[in-house]
Design a protein with these regions (language model features):
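Ferredoxin-reductase
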Residues: 2-81
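Structural signal for conserved beta-strand scaffold positions within catalytic alpha/beta enzyme cores
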Residues: 10, 54, 155-157, 202-204, ...
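FNR/FR-type flavoprotein reductase catalytic core
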Residues: 69-207
Length: 243
């Protein structure tokens, strides 16, 4: 974990209520896709945990949804705004277990970390397939970003207004993939858990207090005892999850 000051370089709307923010700052503490950052906001007691969408030397990209006063405040930030951010939080995804053809499944706010994961897998010569889930076409974001990487991308919408009608599990194939990586709301993760036929890693979205394991506010039960989503997670192995 590392604390630093970051400067907003861009902040654009991707879809209604969904924004992409690029920041300049020290990203050396970020070591794996699936980690998150914790952002301090003026007038707010708790920091806001946001997953890492992408990072490079001196550059951090986050994609966030406006769900309350804090993220609404973020959506109005102009380039040049300075933010106090904790980076390198959480365990992230383990790429060594993926096999050659992993399947990446993201739903809503769980889509951004799939992008950094896809880039890292491609850099290792692996060929991921991607499923992105939305409620309706108007909410779609980042499909073009994944396609620009040369990936096979399937979009699902609950109302059928774009892509496959239904949920992400309606697009999960019976065979042809070696491993599953997923991130999204708990009901989606449970459905993927039940539908997928391989091992995998599941990233959980939980409300957090401190973001680094001190407050014990995001503890969950696993087959191997209690784990803190912010510290030992947010990524858990499929085999250890208790529903």
């Amino acid at each position: 974990m590392k604390r630093g000051l970051f400067t907003v370089t861009s902040n654009e709307q991707l879809a209604p209520g969904t924004f992409r923010m690029v920041l300049a700052g020290d990203t050396t503490a970020i070591t794996a896709p699936g980690q998150f950052v914790n952002i301090a906001l003026e007038g707010k007691f708790l920091r806001r945990p946001i997953s890492v969408c992408d990072w490079g030397e001196g550059s951090l990209t986050i994609v966030y949804k406006v769900v309350g006063q804090g993220t609404e405040q973020m959506s109005r930030m102009a380039p040049g705004t300075r933010l106090d951010i904790l980076t390198g939080l959480g365990n992230g995804y383990d790429l060594n277990k993926s096999g050659d053809r992993p399947l990446l499944i993201g739903g809503g706010a769980g889509i951004p970390p799939m992008f950094a994961l896809a880039k890292k897998l491609l850099a290792q010569g692996k060929i991921p397939s991607v499923i992105l889930g939305f409620n309706q076409a108007a909410e779609q974001f980042m499909q073009a970003d994944f396609q620009a990487l040369g990936l096979d991308v399937t979009v699902t919408t609950a109302d059928g207004s774009l892509g496959v009608k239904g949920f992400v599990t309606d697009a999960v194939p019976q065979t042809g993939y070696t491993y599953v990586y997923t991130c999204g709301p708990a009901p989606m993760l449970k459905a993927v858990y039940d539908k997928s036929v391989t091992s995998g890693q599941f990233s959980f979205e939980e409300r957090m207090g401190c973001g680094f394991g001190a407050c014990m506010g995001c503890t969950c039960q696993t087959k191997y005892g209690n784990k803190r989503i912010c510290r030992e997670g947010p990524v858990l192995e499929k085999e250890e999850i208790l529903w």
